[in-house]
Amino acid sequence: MQIIDGKSVSAKVKEYVKNEAISLKKSGITPTLAVILVGEDKASQTYVASKEKACLACEMGSVMHRLSKETSQSELLALIEVLNLDDSIDGILVQLPLPKHIDTNRVLEAIDPTKDVDGFHAVNVGKLSSGLDGFVPCTPLGIMELLKEYDVNLQGIDAVVIGRSNIVGKPMASLLLNAGATISIAHSKTKNLPEITRRAKLVVVAVGRPNFLNADMVSDGAIVIDVGINRLDSGKLVGDVDFDSVAPKCSLITPVPGGVGPMTIAMLLSNTLKSAKNRKRNV
């Protein structure tokens, strides 16, 4: 059993991004990410601060827009339009969740697809499902980078993705399918789930339930990717996988914390760099 080290892989990605950003700066371009935070959600504030810190560490520009929770949808859309038209901005990220009075889909669709570094716009979703080049959501993209780094051959592999969200489950399935894997998409209500997961060589779990996947649900030698991050009443941070029981059966497994998590911000930086390069070519 080998534990996948997301921290070291993310550090490699960030080092590459930093070197590329320095090169772009020499031609007068600073890859820049604009982040919009609406409200005072503590978790969102933490995420936004970590994104800002990561940008600066990688020699990238960071523009923060902190709006009150009373901000109207029209005000938010107006800000997005300003950022869409600003040539100094390469990536636009709206931190989720948004207050209930704002239509999340309407906001995400307002972002210029060429600056949609989260990969949530319908244009980028369509490109991914069609196997075309666009922006891919950062968490599944980070998982693909981990699998590549650990030399996992996806051609013909039986893979199960547990979770059907637009942020992880669906794009993860598309990426694996595009890479030649044979895909099953399951979720917390799938019948006979253990039978399905035991047939798989690769299991990706993203259901948001602590210790959801147990040892009886995986085959010997399986590769298990845990996307979950859950805080127990005790304060302990755990994933969707019962790590202690599942890990001994695996050939590869991601821990929580330190597995998939660090890759998400690394790939956000990578997507922002990609946008800056694309925009430079189109000048």
From Swiss-Prot:
GO cellular component, one term: cytosol
Keywords: Amino-acid biosynthesis, Histidine biosynthesis, Hydrolase, Methionine biosynthesis, Multifunctional enzyme, NADP, One-carbon metabolism, Oxidoreductase, Purine biosynthesis
UniProt record similarity statement: Belongs to the tetrahydrofolate dehydrogenase/cyclohydrolase family.
EC number: 1.5.1.5, 3.5.4.9
Protein name stated in the entry: Bifunctional protein FolD
Organism of provenance: Campylobacter fetus subsp. fetus (strain 82-40)
Residues involved in NADP(+) binding: 163-165, 188, 229
GO BP term, pick one: tetrahydrofolate interconversion
Subunit structure: Homodimer.
